[in-house]
Design a protein with these regions (language model features):
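Short polybasic linear motifs
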Residues: 12-13, 215
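Ala/Thr-enriched low-complexity intrinsically disordered regions
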Residues: 2, 8, 16, 21-23, ...
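Intrinsically disordered, low-complexity polyampholyte segments enriched for Lys and acidic residues
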Residues: 4-5, 219
């Protein structure tokens, strides 16, 4: 499983569950980080105009998938109030997004698994439909979102069958998401028409900016 392909996406105006997909999808909201750039707070539970960011992500993701898991490593009971199964990392030490993906693949009920970060409340309402299109080709392992020349590796859709491969990578000490992707057949899906949807909120200042409706840096 080697190489990376550049892909163009199928655009859909629908906001219901990924039309035309051949298999159901599990969604995983990644909320397992330490929020260091926001002062060590749990970012997914920070309020954006009165609602936790993770709740806003959930409202965008849930119509597109068949199951939602939340990967979190603290405040588990508060995350459970959002109505989803909450699954902490199996690896200790806050090992990063790959640890969250690993747990998601371990717990997913469906063969296709999409991940999104908890701090991106504006994610596209057709994210899953567009990422799923390249995986109609069985040789493709994983699809990742891209805007311009910038890939967004945490916005990915992959196959559950990759779990043993990811487990071996993590057991060998691998932690960098790009390094794992380099060993797979990855297609990058262009979202140039929705670049602002991938804006994430990393700092208290960016949270205040989002609350006032101003454009975030990089939009």
């Amino acid at each position: 499983m080697t190489g990376k392909k550049q892909g163009t996406s199928r655009h859909s105006s629908l906001v219901t569950r990924h039309p035309g997909a051949t298999a159901p999808v599990t969604g995983v909201i990644l909320a397992g980080g330490l929020g260091r750039r926001m002062g060590g707070v749990d970012k997914g539970l920070q309020l954006l105009n009165g609602r936790p960011m993770a709740a806003r992500v959930l409202s965008r993701l849930a119509p597109q998938v068949d199951e939602v898991l939340i990967n979190a490593n603290q405040n588990l009971e508060r995350y459970k109030l959002l109505g989803c199964r909450v699954v902490p990392d199996q690896l200790g030490g806050y090992a990063g997004p790959l640890a969250g993906l690993h747990r998601g693949l371990s717990e997913a009920r469906h063969e296709l698994v999409v991940t999104v970060p908890c701090d991106s409340p504006f994610l596209p309402e057709d994210l899953v439909a567009r990422l799923a299109a390249p995986l109609h080709d069985e040789s493709v392992d994983l699809a990742v979102a891209r805007t311009g020349i910038q890939a967004h590796p945490v916005f990915c859709l992959c196959r559950r069958r990759l779990l043993p491969h990811l487990t071996a990578f993590l057991q060998d000490g691998g932690r960098k998401i790009d390094a794992w992707y380099a060993s797979l057949n990855v297609v990058e899906v262009a979202f140039d028409d929705e670049a602002a949807a991938f804006s994430n909120i990393n700092t208290a200042e960016e949270l205040r900016t989002a609350e006032t409706g101003q454009r975030l840096p990089g939009e």
